[in-house]
Amino acid sequence: MGYCSGRCTLIFICGMQLVCVLERQIFDFLGYQWAPILANFVHIIIVILGLFGTIQYRPRYVTGYAVWLVLWVTWNVFVICFYLEAGDLSKETDLILTFNISMHRSWWMENGPGCMVTSVTPAPDWAPEDHRYITVSGCFLDYQYIEVAHSSLQIVLALAGFIYACYVVRCITEEEDSFDFIGGFDSYGYQGPQKTSHLQLQPMYMSK
């Protein structure tokens, strides 16, 4: 009963991860955030494999899913540090999330709740010609906190998924080991010990 509930919980967690990361992927595409797009794509593939392993009782797939979650948590911690500008990171000058190939920022920067975008003219000399220079004001919630909330949710789901993945792998392994020792589908018939008769041969004498 416990194994069934743990397996069903892991399936639910995987489903939640897929929904949340697909939502995040859409907005990362709109903001041309190439590094998060690549990370999200890999995460989607691994979660699908983990979901398949959970449904089909494949411990190797679930183990691979659990290992990936460690890397996924690390990535999301980095994203949080990036947007909160921890250490030497700067969300304004560093273009890590776009692989330094564009100056795009998070989609939420211009489209957050209550945000008002104003174009600035003339644009500074350093601004690329194919980009517009803007100011954003009036946001109810700054875009960096929205991105931090997205990453925090992913971390919570990943930690829950890691715990239940380890539990499901242990249950599947124990079930397989116990089944092997029992030999449930042994095709050989059971034969009880047979009694052997011991005959004592004695010489016979015949009279002429």
Curated annotation (Swiss-Prot):
Superkingdom as given in the UniProt entry: Eukaryota
Disulfide bonds listed in the record: none
PANTHER family, per the entry: SODIUM_POTASSIUM-TRANSPORTING ATPASE SUBUNIT BETA-1-INTERACTING PROTEIN 2, T-CELL LYMPHOMA BREAKPOINT-ASSOCIATED TARGET 1-RELATED
One GO CC annotation: plasma membrane
Subunit details: Interacts with ATP1B1.
Free-text tissue specificity from the UniProt record: Detected in the brain only and specifically in neurons; expressed in multiple regions such as cerebral cortex, thalamus, cerebellum, olfactory bulb and brainstem, but not in the hippocampus.
Keyword Transmembrane helix: yes
Presence of keyword Zinc: no
A Pfam family it matches: NKAIN
Compartmental location: Cell membrane
Membrane-spanning parts: 1-23, 35-55, 64-84, 148-168
Topological relation to the membrane, as annotated: Multi-pass membrane protein
Homology family: Belongs to the NKAIN family.
Keyword annotations from UniProtKB, A to Z: Cell membrane, Membrane, Transmembrane, Transmembrane helix
Signal peptide start-end: none
The name this protein goes by in its record: Sodium/potassium-transporting ATPase subunit beta-1-interacting protein 2
